[in-house]
């Protein structure tokens, strides 16, 4: 069931950037209604759907170099899910696949969209959060469009990472 839910969010819910959508979604219901969201919004939907079926799920964050702007650091959101049969947490990235991005449901070896490159200063926040980060949610809820969201995204980085 976990894999089916994950693949639904990854494959059937678009990443807003991949389809050029400027509307910013935040809540699971908004993402489902409009059929798209950025990584963090899609993580809200995935956690909500998993939790509906009693499957423990949390929120994870990464600090990454932008693939679109040189010297720009961006925040990336993904999930962790508890796999009861294996008694372990596994990170899942429902961002959505595209050329160069191949996130998969994999218990043995993590297959997320953006593995960190520490040489570039990228970081994983090691915490699995019970709830989405409040600053991230506030930015998603108050940004009028995706362009405005990206200009404010640094606030989420500062809240989740020391640097």
Question: Model-found features: residue ranges?
Answer:
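A structured, mid-to-C-terminal "fold-capping" secondary-structure block
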Residues: 105-163
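Solvent-exposed, flexible loop/coil residues
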Residues: 19, 23, 28, 35-36, ...
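Active-site nucleophilic cysteine motif
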Residues: 1, 5, 35-45, 50
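Hydrophobic/aromatic-rich core segments of domains that either
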Residues: 41-128
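Short, charge-rich amphipathic segments
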Residues: 8-12, 42, 142-148
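Secondary-structure boundary elements
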Residues: 1-34
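Histidine (H) residue identity feature
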Residues: 14-15, 36, 44, 76
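Secondary-structure capping and boundary motifs in well-ordered enzyme cores
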Residues: 31, 35-38, 71
């Amino acid at each position: 069931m976990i894999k089916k839910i994950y693949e639904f969010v990854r494959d059937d819910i678009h990443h807003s950037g991949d389809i050029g959508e400027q509307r910013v979604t935040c809540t699971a219901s908004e993402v489902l209604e409009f059929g798209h969201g950025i990584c963090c919004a899609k993580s809200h939907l995935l956690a909500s759907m998993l939790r509906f079926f009693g499957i423990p799920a949390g929120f994870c964050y990464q600090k990454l170099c932008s693939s679109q702007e040189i010297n720009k650091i961006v925040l990336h959101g993904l999930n962790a899910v508890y796999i009861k049969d294996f008694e372990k947490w596994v990170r899942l990235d429902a961002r959505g696949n595209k050329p160069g991005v191949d996130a998969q449901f994999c218990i043995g070896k993590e297959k997320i969209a953006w593995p960190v490159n520490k040489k570039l200063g990228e970081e994983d926040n090691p915490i699995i959060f019970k709830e989405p980060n409040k600053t991230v949610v506030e930015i998603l809820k108050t940004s009028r469009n995706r362009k405005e969201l990206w200009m404010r995204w640094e606030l989420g980085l500062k809240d989740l990472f020391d640097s």
